[in-house]
Structure formats: structure tokens, C-alpha cells
Design a protein with these regions (language model features):
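C-terminal alpha-helical interaction appendages
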Residues: 1-88
Length: 88
């Protein structure tokens, strides 16, 4: 998905509550969907790590970057992204 498609999906599914959702910028291809209560974007951990390796990081570096920076995006915020393991 493109960033615009992610936003469009969230607006279509969540309506006004889409404005509250925190998205993980740069990980649009890892976007899977949304939760309703509370409204949150859902991403694949594996696809996020793949996106980082596609930027030139080794798998180890990508995993460190993901768990150290990406997965902690606004982690104390009710509308922070959800990251789940997916089968690949």
C-alpha cells in the first residue's frame, strides 16, 4: 500500500476516529489493517524488518532498529500501532 492508501483505508474503516491513529511512517507495505477499540493501525513485524533490510541494513541491524525504535512508537499512547508476527 501507499501512504495515501493506508490513510484512505483507516478513514473508510474508522471514520473520524482515523485521525487519532498513529501510523508507522515508512512501513506502508507492512500495514495489515486496523483495530476498532481503541482505533489502532496493525503492522506485520516481519514485513517491517524486511522494509529495513531493503534500506540496506543487515537482518541483525534491522531487528535491532525495529525493536529499539519502530516498535516503541508512542508505546504509551492508546492509539499507538500494533505490531504482530505474521507467517511468511
Amino acid at each position: 500500500m501507499t501512504p495515501e492508501e493506508v490513510i484512505e483505508f483507516l478513514e473508510d474503516k474508522l471514520g473520524r476516529e482515523a485521525e487519532e491513529v498513529i501510523v508507522a511512517e515508512g512501513f506502508d507495505r507492512a500495514f495489515l489493517g486496523a483495530s476498532l477499540e481503541p482505533p489502532r493501525a496493525i503492522y506485520s513485524i516481519e514485513l517491517c524488518i524486511d522494509a529495513l533490510t531493503n534500506q540496506g541494513l543487515s537482518t541483525s541491524e534491522a531487528e535491532d532498529q525495529f525493536w529499539g525504535s519502530v516498535a516503541t512508537i508512542a508505546e504509551d499512547h492508546e492509539n499507538a500501532p500494533i505490531f504482530i508476527h505474521t507467517l511468511t
